[in-house]
Amino acid sequence: MNPYLNFIQLAQGISQLEKFPLMTHLSKIILDHVALNERQSNPLSVRQLISIDAIASPATIHKHLSRLRKSGYVGVDENITDKRTKPLVLTPLGHQYIDALSKALQKSLKV
């Protein structure tokens, strides 16, 4: 079977696990942006995320970001000196979700 299709099937299964609150496709894209920037030690601010036109309109991004925060996937780093910016970071649940997807990708490549 195609490794990509295996991954898609495994990822859908992960998304349906009870410990991971449901996310929309757009929320997953936003979560990916937050995770990638955090990994590069350059966390996105709320303002930077909202300004990425390729994702959606600012209002739509803000709505989905609020859902991600309420669901516990994303938080704001409060341990910064400049209180004018609000860097977005993955929460432990966000890291667990990304780790589960990573394991699914590795598993799909072994088949």
Give residue spans per PLM region:
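Short amphipathic alpha-helical interaction segments
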Residues: 55-70
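Beta-hairpin "wing" of winged helix-turn-helix
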Residues: 71-84
